[in-house]
UniProtKB/Swiss-Prot annotation:
This is Metalloproteinase inhibitor 3. GO terms for molecular function: metal ion binding; metalloendopeptidase inhibitor activity. Residues 1-23 form the signal peptide. Interacts with EFEMP1. Interacts with KDR. Keywords: Disease variant, Disulfide bond, Extracellular matrix, Metal-binding, Metalloenzyme inhibitor, Metalloprotease inhibitor, Protease inhibitor, Secreted, Sensory transduction, Signal, Vision, Zinc. The gene is TIMP3.
Length: 211
């Protein structure tokens, strides 16, 4: 059993009697949470793929050309292959070969990087400027903050290290404005709040200048 299959079993999103059903269910995740909770975050281009006999439906192994690493230097400084379930119903990820650069996030198991539909994976050219800046330094600064999801009103922050994420309340849904343009960063005084990035909120915390 691969790590992703085990995760889906724990989530209870499918039953053993219905392996072929469309069953991949993921909760929305802010890109900052995806960054902070991933072992590996990289920008890469897929240059090949093959199906290997692992698990009930096999595992897709993508060969990648790593362009840049944002997180995971101690876990796996250079990633050559990424693994995902072959079946989309088990959250397997389908990527184009020799076409796009991707932002890829995932976990490391037994020296291999695994990813899937519940990870934050996006074409690089689809990321906003704020998201790219987040990958470079802002998201890392906010990993001690907590992004609290709000699905319906009323909802409140309950501690000073929380940012209230309300994209799901918008008519536009997820991903919304906070996902695309904001990071939750600890401010002077120890509290966390959303930061758009016109100027560093506290130069003792963020040692960077926006272009």
């Amino acid at each position: 059993m691969t790590p992703w299959l085990g995760l889906i079993v724990l989530l209870g999103s499918w039953s053993l009697g219905d392996w072929g059903a469309e069953a991949c269910t993921c909760s929305p995740s802010h890109p900052q949470d995806a960054f902070c909770n991933s072992d590996i975050v990289i920008r890469a281009k897929v240059v090949g793929k093959k199906l290997v006999k692992e698990g009930p439906f096999g595992t897709l192994v993508y060969t990648i050309k790593q362009m840049k690493m944002y997180r995971g230097f101690t876990k796996m400084p250079h990633v050559q292959y990424i693994h995902t379930e072959a079946s989309e119903s088990l959250c397997g990820l389908k990527l184009e070969v020799n076409k796009y650069q991707y932002l890829l996030t995932g976990r490391v198991y037994d020296g291999k990087m695994y990813t899937g539909l519940c990870n934050f994976v996006e074409r690089w050219d689809q990321l906003t400027l704020s998201q790219r800046k987040g990958l470079n330094y802002r998201y890392h600064l906010g990993c001690n903050c907590k992004i609290k999801s709000c699905y319906y009103l009323p909802c409140f922050v309950t501690s000073k290290n929380e940012c209230l994420w309300t994209d799901m309340l918008s008519n536009f849904g997820y991903p919304g404005y906070q996902s695309k343009h904001y990071a939750c960063i600890r401010q002077k005084g120890g509290y966390c709040s959303w930061y758009r990035g016109w100027a560093p909120p506290d130069k003792s915390i963020i040692n960077a200048t926006d272009p």
